[in-house]
Amino acid sequence: MEKLSEKDKELIRGSWESLGKNKVPHGVVMFSRLFELDPELLTLFHYTTNCGSTQDCLSSPEFLEHVTKVMLVIDAAVSNLDDLPSLEDFLLNLGRKHQAVGVNTQSFAEVGESLLHMLQCSLGQAYTAPLRQAWLNLYSIVVAAMSQGWAKNGEDKAD
């Protein structure tokens, strides 16, 4: 698993400090963008409330619980910047779970774009090119592990 530079860690921690305290509203911004990029992803969410539209999903308590979980994964990554390998098993398993429910790996890129969108909207002028790159570096590490788990789960099903 790759490592981040000390500068990347500093930028990520500094930007997450305020965002991490208010996870759900920031997560809603992120998922709103995700559903703009790929409305078909709405069909993957099966809750008591039908996620036929972005607004249906974003007003569903069950979906907001999912948003919270996603934001907690980001929080865990930020909290473990000095020891990202400690998250590897968790991320591999997360990739397996996403493969099992029909998420394709292309969607990981759209989630990354949505994360950057949320950061830009939330941070305003504090969102700089170096900060964007630092988050991209972290996200690429997270996605690499999730993609391995995703692929492994697909291989297991093929056997």
From Swiss-Prot:
It catalyses: Fe(III)-heme b-[protein] + nitric oxide + H2O = Fe(II)-heme b-[protein] + nitrite + 2 H(+). It comes from the Eukaryota. InterPro entries: Globin, Globin-like_OT, Globin-like_sf, Globin/Proto. Heme b binds at H66, H98. Pfam families: Globin. Its EC number is 1.7.-.-. It is an enzyme of class 1 (oxidoreductase). GO terms for cellular component: cytosol; mitochondrial matrix. It is found in: Cytoplasm, Cytosol; Mitochondrion matrix. GO terms for molecular function: GDP-dissociation inhibitor activity; heme binding; metal ion binding; nitrite reductase activity; oxygen binding. Residues 3-151 form the Globin domain. One of its GO terms (biological process) is cellular response to hypoxia. Keywords: Cytoplasm, Heme, Iron, Metal-binding, Mitochondrion, Oxidoreductase. Belongs to the globin family. Monomer. Homodimers and homotetramers. Mainly monomeric but also detected as part of homodimers and homotetramers. Monomeric globin with a bis-histidyl six-coordinate heme-iron atom through which it can bind dioxygen, carbon monoxide and nitric oxide. Could help transport oxygen and increase its availability to the metabolically active neuronal tissues, though its low quantity in tissues as well as its high affinity for dioxygen, which may limit its oxygen-releasing ability, argue against it. The ferrous/deoxygenated form exhibits a nitrite reductase activity and it could produce nitric oxide which in turn inhibits cellular respiration in response to hypoxia. This is Neuroglobin.
